[in-house]
Amino acid sequence: MSADKVTLADLPLRDNLRGKSPYGAPQLQVPVRLNTNENPHPPSKALVDDVAASVREAAAELHRYPDRDAVALRTDLAAYLTAATGVRLGVENLWAANGSNEILQQLLQAFGGPGRTAIGFVPSYSMHPIISDGTQTEWLQASRAEDFGLDIDVAVSAVTERKPDVVFVTSPNNPSGQSVPLDDLRRVLDAMQGGILIVDEAYGEFSSQPSAVALLDDY
């Protein structure tokens, strides 16, 4: 078989990945692109100059790996989130990776995997089940309310009955935009019998509710 005729179906993929469709967010030529969470305003000249200067400085060390723990970045992120949420956070509370999808994958590699389950409340962010499949974590789901907000009674019942190892709650929800109150997150946490709750706050700057980091000291 010549290389130019090889298709994805010819490759030795895992059986559970065959027939799956890749994730993709449409790249639309419109001023506001909330589907990809992009800032509609271009960076200022001062910011561009600052980034260029920082890249030039870092380029002198391109022959070395960067800090694998990203301590400087995590320090700055902790300061930003402390100011944004009012909850004191330190480097130990933060992890950094190449986008939130990589973080989600790392979480499921650590806390999901074969023989474990993850649950989400749909419709919600489509990457949650895709990453679950990719990490061989069995995907479970429960429905949201008619307005696509989180039906907390349904969520608590699903968590209690199905005992998932990982629970996904998106706040604000993607794509419908509703935020989840802290009291509802407490109910989910209290219903869990082990495992971890992942509150996906990718659109946190648009939230109408406090960040879930406010619950760290209690749980």
From Swiss-Prot:
Superkingdom in the source lineage: Bacteria
Q: Which UniProt keywords apply?
A: Amino-acid biosynthesis, Aminotransferase, Histidine biosynthesis, Pyridoxal phosphate, Transferase
Tell me the Gene Ontology biological-process terms attached to this UniProt entry. L-histidine biosynthetic process
Q: Which reaction does it catalyse?
A: L-histidinol phosphate + 2-oxoglutarate = 3-(imidazol-4-yl)-2-oxopropyl phosphate + L-glutamate
Has keyword Ligase? Answer: no
Q: Where are the transmembrane segments?
A: none
Q: Name one GO molecular function term.
A: pyridoxal phosphate binding
EC number(s) stated in the UniProt entry for this protein: 2.6.1.9
Q: Report the cofactors.
A: pyridoxal 5'-phosphate
What Pfam family is a match for this entry?
Answer: Aminotran_1_2
**What CDD domains is this protein classified in?**
AAT_like
Enzyme kind, highest EC tier: transferase
Pathway field: Amino-acid biosynthesis; L-histidine biosynthesis; L-histidine from 5-phospho-alpha-D-ribose 1-diphosphate: step 7/9
**Into which family does the record put it?**
Belongs to the class-II pyridoxal-phosphate-dependent aminotransferase family. Histidinol-phosphate aminotransferase subfamily.
- What assembly does the database describe for this protein? Homodimer.
Entry protein name:
Histidinol-phosphate aminotransferase
Q: Which organism is it from?
A: Mycolicibacterium smegmatis (Mycobacterium smegmatis)
